[in-house]
Regions:
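Short alpha-beta junction capping motif
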Residues: 1-37, 122
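Structural recognition of the beta-strand scaffold that forms the well-ordered cores
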Residues: 1-3, 26-31, 95-98, 125-129, ...
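Short, solvent-exposed loop/turn segments at secondary-structure junctions
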Residues: 7, 34-36, 101-104, 121-122, ...
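Beta-propeller domains with acidic blade repeats across secreted/periplasmic ectodomains
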Residues: 11, 168-478
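Glycine-rich, charge-decorated loop segments at or immediately adjacent to ligand/cofactor-binding or catalytic sites
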Residues: 35-46
């Protein structure tokens, strides 16, 4: 699909697109796509016409081929849109489905072709001129037009596989509950979605093309995982927190624990579960170091170690203390073992205020590092709000994310370099803080339609990723 204003296309790109469609691919150019790629005249012929001019008005595009499968379930709808006028029409293999009746200012008095389909070799093309802005895109009848058009364009076999897949999923069930927040001030709060089994939930998860999901461990063996790490033996260590975020207990004795999940028979699923340590209250991260585990357990950082080989921690010591617990949503997190043998982490607006090896530190909303034995600490990069993500590229540069409106920042020069000079804050590098989830029923609290729960910043550096991904893409949870 294309929905964009791009003036040029390379010859190689055009050859690939043309070949894709002629060999059976589906192509869905929408609205301004009919203006694109003026340097390739053949592109207009593939689309079926080219945008020439427009005004703007409230109008209803009229259906003229109601029986066509690309209009299955589609109703006419009225909305403000740009009143496209096309030229360079290619009527070969084209069927016009909807038209816009002539209106004042049009260069002609005939109905203007508005939505059409055409065939190109073995492939199919669906085009609609609708879609200038949210006045159209927010319309449920436009959603149906796009859905029906896409399902026609992909072809009958792909559509049949899609419908078979939908039929295999357990239907989602909802119920109204009084305690569901309505921060967005919708006319009605979103209903509560009843839970699915992990297996059924995976069917509702969309993975990138070429990727697949595999279930390694799930409830009831692990509960409320808040962080995990893989060890050198391929075992998954999971930090479980049933107390997070509201059950902050006096003395910090709680119900949370670290659990080792192991696949003992090589079938790709965990079948052995061992509690390494328990009795914690809202731990938020862990990292392997010094033959054991360092656990973020505000206000303290703990070192845990198994000394007798039974996979249970029998040594527990406090490395340092000082992290705030005023808001459990804003404490330390995302511990990572750095290339320089320091431990890196993030903290939000529940800041660190304490001493490490006799030196006073006071910082918040940024990244820090410390030595694995707790003998030294440094605050590295200041950012502007609740910091919950850190990651390294292959060169060891530090990147991160914040909960609100800043899904990706570059650490740059650390504060330790500046000494007494004015320091430079980390800089946002994301092109936009906007958040585009696949499902529509997303509850947000602060930055509506943008990142309001951003966390993590893991670069795709493994050789298991496509070459085009490596060191060029990062995963940030929303």
């Amino acid at each position: 699909s294309i929905y964009a204003n791009h003036p040029r296309l390379t010859a190689k790109q055009w050859k690939n697109l043309q070949s894709y469609v002629r060999n059976g691919g589906g192509f869905v150019p929408v609205h301004c796509a009919s203006w694109c790629f003026s340097n390739i005249p053949e592109f207009d012929q593939l689309v079926g016409g080219r945008f020439k001019s427009h005004q703007g008005a409230d109008f209803t595009a009229r259906v003229v081929k109601k029986e066509h499968p690309a209009l299955s379930g589609v109703k006419e709808f009225k909305a403000w849109d740009e009143t496209y006028f096309h030229h360079r029409h290619n009527e070969k293999g084209r069927t016009v489905l909807m038209v816009r009746d002539a209106m004042p200012g049009d260069p002609h008095t005939k109905p203007e072709p508005w939505t059409w389909v055409r065939t190109e070799g073995k492939g199919r093309v669906f085009y609609t001129a609708s879609g200038h802005d949210q006045r159209v895109w927010n319309h449920t009848d436009f959603h149906q037009l796009m859905k029906s058009g896409i399902l026609w364009a992909v072809g009958d076999k792909a559509k049949a596989r899609y419908e078979k897949f939908l039929a295999s999923r357990v239907p989602l069930k909802y119920e109204k509950r009084d305690n569901v927040p309505n921060y967005e001030r919708r006319p009605e709060p979103l209903p509560y979605q009843l839970p699915l089994s992990p297996e059924e939930s995976m069917k509702y998860t969309q993975a990138p093309v070429g990727f697949r999901l595999e279930l390694f461990a799930s409830e009831p063996e692990i509960i409320n995982p808040i962080y995990f790490q893989w060890d050198e033996r391929g075992r998954l260590w999971v930090v479980e927190s049933v107390d997070y975020p509201n059950e902050l207990k006096p003395g910090r004795k709680g119900n949370d624990r670290i659990k080792i999940c192991e696949d003992t028979n090589g079938d790709g699923k965990a079948d052995k579960f061992t509690v390494f340590a328990d009795g914690f209250n809202i731990p938020t991260s862990m990292v392997f170091a010094r033959g054991g585990v360092i656990l973020a357990h505000a206000p303290e950082f703990l070192f845990l170690k198994d000394t007798d080989g039974d996979d249970k921690a029998d040594q527990r010591e406090v490395l340092f203390t000082g992290f705030g617990v005023g808001d459990t949503h804003a404490g330390p997190s995302n511990l990572r073992y750095g290339f320089d043998n320091w431990i890196y982490g993030t903290v939000g607006y529940s800041p660190f205020n304490g001493e490490v090896n006799g030196e006073k530190h006071n910082f918040g909303s940024g990244t820090f590092r410390f030595r694995p034995d707790g003998s030294d600490m440094e605050f590295l990069h200041q950012f502007n709000n609740n910091t919950w993500g850190i990651g390294f590229n292959e060169a060891g540069d530090v990147f991160g994310s914040t909960a609100n409106n800043n899904p990706s920042f570059f650490g740059g020069i650390p504060n330790t370099v500046f000494g007494s000079q004015r320091r430079m804050s980390a800089k946002m590098i994301a092109s936009s803080p906007k958040f585009h989830p696949i499902p529509p029923n997303i509850r947000q609290v602060d930055a509506f339609n943008a990142y309001t729960a951003g966390c993590g910043h893991a670069f795709a550096t493994s050789s298991g990723f496509p070459k085009s991904w490596r060191d060029r893409r990062a995963f940030v949870c929303g």
